[in-house]
């Protein structure tokens, strides 16, 4: 009888060890939030009021392709974004081109303002802040700081 209890206690020890090893591998809602898929699901399921509550407090540190995805969410859910009343204006807006073109139709030369739209500007100063310098750090950025880099959003002043 004593021998049977000792054998059973050995199997209980083994079961306990296996359980301690396996339990951390089972995804929980809290653990899922720390994976990329979990964050995507969290961002997708948030309501407008949820976004307003976390906009200035929640920080995320993102680099490279994860930074691009984070910027997508910040631009998409920007709580200060102004909605457009009329169609989106782009650099090739016909009215703007007609106003700035002084050459007759069919000219081989572009007006200087129109030609400059095709040039990319480069930062000359290496110390100029960038989204990577700001948000690819241990502290990360708030949603508000990410949204400041949204390329096409018109935003309300909130300060």
Swiss-Prot record:
InterPro entries reported in the protein's UniProt record: Insulin-like_sf (IPR036438)
Signal peptide feature range: 1-31
An annotated GO BP: insulin receptor signaling pathway
Propeptide residues per the UniProt entry: 90-121
Superkingdom to which the source organism belongs: Eukaryota
Tissues where this protein is expressed: Broadly expressed at a low level throughout the embryo, except the yolk. Expressed at a moderate level in the embryonic midgut. Larval expression is restricted to ten cells of the ventral nerve cord - in four pairs of centrally located cells in the most posterior abdominal segments and in one pair of dorsally located cells in the A1 or A2 segments.
Subcellular location(s) per record: Secreted
Disulphide bond pairs: 63-136, 75-150, 135-141
A GO molecular-function descriptor: insulin receptor binding
Keyword vocabulary terms for this entry: Cleavage on pair of basic residues, Disulfide bond, Secreted, Signal
Signal recorded as keyword: yes
Gene Ontology cellular component list: extracellular region; extracellular space
Role description: Possible ligand of InR/insulin-like receptor.
Self-association state and partner proteins as the record states: Heterodimer of a B chain and an A chain linked by two disulfide bonds.
Similarity comment: Belongs to the insulin family.
Protein name per UniProt: Insulin-like peptide 7
Organism in which the protein naturally occurs: Drosophila melanogaster
Primary gene name: Ilp7
